[in-house]
Regions:
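Catalytic adenosine-cofactor/nucleotide-binding cores of aminoacyl-tRNA synthetases and other
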Residues: 8-11, 16-182, 244-278
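Short active-site loop/helix that positions an aromatic residue
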Residues: 1-8
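C-terminal accessory/binding modules appended to enzymatic or scaffolding proteins
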Residues: 186-243, 248
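Generic structural signal for hydrophobic residues
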Residues: 1, 71, 135, 220-221
Length: 278
């Protein structure tokens, strides 16, 4: 750039130039490229980009579910340091602290897990109302119409598991619709000939309760397992599979309260009927 300015005789109006350090591959061997992103499973462009020659489309950070402010924060700290250990800074603070003198001379290794950590921190700082707005696109894509107040409750329940925006849906879809299939390996591991009768007995008792809150459900479960001389997991793990489809997810008491008693019992009955046919 300097040579171009000089060749055109524009030296008097030439701005000061400074080169930021290269962003290196995660192992530090060479500069980061699109090929590295494709190979290692992360984006290298801020937005979706289509190669004009190959017509190959690459998803960007925006498409992966990064918040703009998290992306900027992460990128600013590649090759530059603010002079202290604080990592989370908004754009205004980054601008106020920036100085050429603190730009490093060596390349900066890109860390995908660290990039997701930044996004996770920003997601945790958002209100449930803001998270619900972030989740709206995934709800629409999956044909889900839900009460905004319910969506906010869902976001509050799964927010700690979300590192990228799509994680909100990935960790909560079962709070909007019943599972259509069940984790076969999980079923084989916890199911026994006595399990269906045990579950039906608990469901019968659950159907008779009038108050359906986490505390009341917890008391119901503890009373049941004590009277039947079983471990809590012998009841709760099969119930989780029937209600969620797998052994993953937030606490079962929280799930049960959120989806409501009728939906809970409906899923239990439907799941038992389906598994009986397998």
């Amino acid at each position: 750039h300097v040579v171009l300015y000089r060749s055109f005789g524009w030296e008097e109006s030439m701005p000061y130039f400074a080169h930021l350090p290269l962003v290196l591959k995660p192992d530090g061997n060479g500069k980061l490229s699109k090929r590295d992103g494709d190979r290692l499973g992360f984006p290298v462009f801020p937005l979706e980009w289509t190669d004009p020659v190959s017509h190959e489309t690459s998803r960007g950070y925006n498409d992966y579910g990064f918040l703009p402010e998290a992306f900027i924060n992460m990128l600013a700290l590649l090759g530059w340091n603010p002079g202290h250990d604080k990592e989370l800074m908004d754009l205004e603070e980054l601008i106020s602290l920036f100085s050429i003198e603190r730009i490093g001379k060596s390349g900066a290794k890109f860390d995908w897990e660290k990039a997701k950590w930044f996004n996770h921190q920003y997601l945790q700082a958002m209100s449930t109302e803001q998270l619900a707005l972030c989740m709206q696109a995934d709800l629409e894509k999956n044909g889900v119409k839900a009460d905004p107040a319910y969506v906010k409750k869902v976001c509050g329940l799964v927010r700690e598991r979300a590192f990228l925006i799509p994680d909100l849906w990935a960790n909560s879809w079962f709070l909007f619709r019943a599972p259509e299939k069940y984790d076969e390996q999980a079923v084989k591991k916890v199911w026994s000939p006595e399990t269906p009768a045990l579950i039906r007995s608990f469901a019968g008792e659950a159907a008779s309760v009038t108050v359906w809150t986490q505390d009341h459900i917890h008391t119901l479960v503890q009373d049941f397992v004590t009277r039947n001389g079983i471990r809590t997991g012998q009841l709760m793990t099969p119930l989780r599979i029937l209600v969620v489809g797998s052994t993953q997810g937030p606490g079962m008491m929280e799930i049960a309260e959120l989806i409501g008693k009728e939906e809970f019992l409906s899923r239990v009955k439907s799941g038992l009927d389906r598994l009986a046919r397998i």
